[in-house]
Each structure stands twice: as C-alpha cells, then as structure tokens.
Amino acid sequence: MSGFVGILVSDPWLQNQFTQVELRSLKSHFTSMKRESGKLTVSDLASRMGKSKVVGDQNLSNEERATLIQNFHPNLNDEVDFEFYLRIYLNLQAHVNAIIGSGVKNSSAFLKAATTTLLHTISDSEKSSYVAHINNYLSGDEFLNKCLPINPSSNDLFEVAKDGVLLCKLINVAVPGTIDERAINTKSMLNPWERNENHTLCLNSAKAIGCTVVNIGTQDIIEGRRHLVLGVISQIIKIQLLADLNLKKTPQLVELVGDSKDVEELMSLPPEKILLRWMNFQLRKTEYKKTVTNFSSDVKDAEAYTNLLNVLAPEHKNPSHLAVKSSFERAKLVLEHADKMGCRRYLTAKDIVEGSPNLNLAFVAHIFQHRNGLSTQTKQISFLENLADDIQISREEKAFRFWINSFDGSVYINNVFEDLRDGWILLQTLDKVSPGIVNWKVSSKPPIKLPFKKVENCNQVVKLGKQLKFSLVNIAGNDIVQGNKKLILAYLWQLMRYNILQLLKNLRLHSNGKEITDADILEWANAKVRNNGCKTRMYSFRDKSLSDGVFFLELLSSVQPRSVNWSLVTNGVTDEEKKMNATYVISIARKLGCSIFLLPEDIIEVNQKMMLTLTASIMYWTLKQPLHLNKPIGSPDSHNGSLLDDSTSDSSIE
C-alpha cells in the first residue's frame, strides 16, 4: 500500500537469486550487524550472523559457519560490503541445503520465531498436513465451499490462497474474531485493488495475532510464492494449535508446578515450552526415563509417544508395543492408538521417525487438546487465586510484544516481562526507533551471566529514555532487571509513542523540524472528519464518545472514501453494537495498511494509549500515500502542499 523502492544489486545474477522481500530482510540484517561497530569484516561475520539468526542456526554452529566463511574468503581482515554478504549467504545456504537434503529439516518455518524461511523449498508432507487442517476447519465456510476440499497432493492450495480470503478465514479460526469478515472482499471476481486489500488485511491481522511477516508482501501472495505462503499458514496453524497452552484457557496446567513462584515462571514460558513440560510431566508417570527436549530427535523412536498415550488412554494400551524393535512399526502403532482415542492427526509414521519438528509439535498439540490428562480438581488451582489477574496488563503486554516482534524479524520475544530483563532487546529496539543512539561498546550481549552487566544494560536503557525526553521519574535500571511490570509497560508505551511521533515527523516535510504532538494528531483527525462533512468530534483521546467507534469509521471514510460500508455500521448504543463497530474499525484500518495492535475492547473502553496509536497509524498511512499533499503542521486543511518522501517507511507502524 505504501511506496517501495527496490534494493538494487550491481550483479544481475546475484540480483536474480533473491526476491525483493528477501533482499530487504537481508539488507536490514546486514545494516544491523554493521551498526554495532561501524564496519563489518570477514572475521566478524560468523558470530554476528549467528546472533542475528540469519542463516540456518539450527543446523550450523558458529564454529562451522566460521570455517565455511574462511574457506570461501581466507582474508579475515577484509571489510564486507552488502554484495559480498549476499554471496556468503548463498554459500552457507547451499551448505545447509546439502546437509538437510530432502529430509526432516527441509521444511517451512513453524517452530522458529520468524514466519518465513528464506529456503525456497517446502516439505510436501507439511503442505499435505496443513491442507488437511484447512479442509477440516474451513469445510463449512460458505464462500470457500466452491474450492474445498483442496487436493493435498497438488499445489491448489497456493492458487486458492491468491485472493486472500482463505488466509483471512484461517486467521479467524486460529484467533476467533480477529477479522471482521464483513471487511473481507468476497466477490467471485476481485479486481487487483480488492485482492490487494485482502492481502493487506491478512498480513496486518497475522502480525496482530503474533506472526512475524517481515519477509512476505502482498505481491508474494499474488504470485503464489509457495515457501512464503506456507510459512504464514504454518504459523497461523501453530497459533491455533497452541491456543490452549496457557493458564487462562487451561487452569489445570497449574498441576505442572509446585508453588506460586513456579506458576509465574510457567506463565512466562512460550506455549511450545509449556507443551514440552506437560509431555514430560505425563511421561514421569511411566517407566520412561528420558526427558523430551524437542519435537524432533527426542521423539523419532516413538517410545516417548507410546508411553504418553499409554498414560492418557490406558484403555487402548498394549504392552507389546514397547517391545517392538522397529521405530517405524512403533510409530505406526502410536498412530493407531491415537486414532482409537479419536485424536485427529495429520502426520504419518514416516514424519515421526524422520523427526519432523513442525508436524510432531502439531501432533502433540492435538493430543493435548483432545485429552490432556490433567486434574480437574480445584485444589491446585487455588494457586492462581493468589496471582494478580490484571487483564489490562496482559492486554498491553501482548500489544507491546507484537509491536517489538514486528520490526524486522531480528528480534523476537515471547514475554515482555521476562525477555527484556537483561536490557539487550530494549537496546536493540531503541536503536531501531532512534538509529545510532545506543553505545554498543558499553553494552553486554546475552547470555549475560553477571547480574551487574544486566543492570548496566538497563541503566543505559533508562538513560537513553531520558535523552528521548521520556517521563522516567520512578524508573531505574534495576526495575527492569527485576521485571517490574507496570514500570516496564510505562517505558514501552513511551517508546512506542516516540516511534509513532518520529515517523509522522519524518513524513511531514513542512513541519520545519517542529516536534509533532498528541494535539497535532488530534487536530489532524478532527480536521479530516470535519472536512468530510461530518459533525462528530474527538475532544481528547479519553473522550468517552469514542466508545461507539463511529468517529474512527468517519475518519477512515475521510481518508479513503470507499473503505467503509455504512450499511454495516450500527448506532453503537448497546455493548454488542459497540463491539461490532469496534471490530469493523480495526479490520478496515488493517485493510487500508495500518499495522495496529489493539482489541475491540480498547475502543469500547476508550483506552487512551490505544486511541492515540490507532489515530496516529491512520494518519501515518494517509501521509504515506504517494499522491497525498500536505500543508504545514496545524493547518486545518491538509490537501495542499508537496509530495511526501516515503523512504522512512520501513518500520512497524505502517
């Protein structure tokens, strides 16, 4: 939706090895690696590429990577430019491909933080599994009936996905209510603009539920780039399968821990780690002595599965299964056992013995959903009553987490309060928001064993916040190290707000260096709505009249007249009507191109922070339009001025 200048490489052959989204991602990684010391030499590459998780870190150690790089270019003191870096990247990828061949690890991203892998290969087994999943969960959809079921042995999936409807529907299966389906363009024949709107809605909504989509654009979906599309699908399905792996959805998980301190630790774990902990908890009830640490090599012999299912479904237990010597035969018996339990599964015995991490995780998640074997007694659950269940804190934590994860894929956190405590990711985020501000020479990289080094990092975080004029009267570095929730959220809000205001300042060429304020955003929004002939007004970002969502729909209609179907808008009187309008507002904003991380409840409750970010995101999208003309800041009419420069738009508020 925004302007985009492609990254050019002087060597045509090298240029043709990558898509523009890949070049953009690799350029971002390269710039980030170079930024630490101002230059990048061959000797630096191995460690910095490993830290940035650019190339197959699950397959190459730093030592292996360093050896390969040295073999390719022995002079370690030479400085690395971007094209040299691309050639190194291709060589390492070729080596990784040679190792994994057509086997287990040759698959789309699923367990990884990043949504899409840059390997241009996909696993047919995974594709078939995801198609089976889609056929199962979307079989009753009225619009998709004409193209379902999809043939898992063909590439029909990527054709069906091209109009964006299937991906939007799949997101709603994973996290119900994320997309207001009234906002999806579902005509039988979509024009390019309508199709692009669906893709934009899909990608912004995927970001909003926790997917990282930095390597994929709307054009990739249109072109049916299989490895990229499958990467998005796999993460959406993963989010669905792991949705119950938290104490809110499954309070019985408290049985896995001993006291309230352990409960807090459990709450901070990513869902796949909780799933592993649950699996080992059940296995301790058997004679199985090993600890399962992954969904690949540790389950390849199917022994862990045999014991797990014997515990969960003893009525189908057969002692002879453990005596089977062939892993493949044992895997087949495991799947028979799962079938008898009524547990739907989409993997084969071959997938188990080959250790497919994505499909094994999906299999265990299905088992957990079907029969978790946890106590329904309330005795252990009493621990939960002693924990503060602050819904607002949980909601803001999720918004800030997804915001941090949305930058460029080089940073990924699972829990704001745990993953930011050493200060390193906060420093990285500060450097993205205000490039060059961090003094990397006095910063310590993880793993950080000495506590005072964490405090030093966090002290710099606080110092830089004050430099950016944050209000940090009661915040010290040690508060971040200690995981003080309210103070961390207060810092992150100011960091997000600074990011938004700087983006707007960069786009408003007529600001003459003037800082943009909350009042400027408020006046811009009111002027837009007023000039569109509407009488509604927002008096502040706390204005309770915003709860019906109508003002934001009028704002969206003023910046893109065809965006709102007013026949779908309610009066916003009852709670249900307000929720319908709020959901519609969020979906229309994402459909235009706004990357926003809020829930309908934030609009209904008039969450001041989220009202500001929503308005600013709509303003930012409007100012980025290539033909949009603007007057100086504070002008009531923003339809005159000069063309905008969109070169600063590589950010998470889009």
From Swiss-Prot:
Quaternary structure annotation from Swiss-Prot or TrEMBL? Interacts with F-actin.
Q: What is this protein called?
A: Fimbrin-2
Q: What is its main location?
A: cytoplasm
Domain Calponin-homology (CH), residue spans:
124-241, 269-372, 394-500, 515-623
What GO molecular function annotations does the UniProt record carry, in alphabetical order?
actin filament binding
Top-level taxonomic group: Eukaryota
- Actin-binding 2 as annotated region, ranges: 394-623
| A single GO cellular-component term on record | cytoskeleton
Where is this protein localized, as stated in its record?
A: Cytoplasm, Cytoskeleton
One of this protein's GO BP terms? actin filament bundle assembly
| Residue segments, region Actin-binding 1 | 124-372
> Looking at the Swiss-Prot or TrEMBL record, what is one Pfam family this protein matches?
CH
Which InterPro entries does the entry link to?
Answer: Actinin_actin-bd_CS, CH_dom, CH_dom_sf, EF-hand-dom_pair, Fimbrin/Plastin
Supply the alphabetized keyword list: Actin-binding, Cytoplasm, Cytoskeleton, Repeat
Q: Which PANTHER family match?
A: FI19014P1, FIMBRIN/PLASTIN
Q: What does this protein do?
A: Cross-links actin filaments (F-actin). Stabilizes and prevents F-actin depolymerization mediated by profilin. May regulate actin cytoarchitecture, cell cycle, cell division, cell elongation and cytoplasmic tractus.
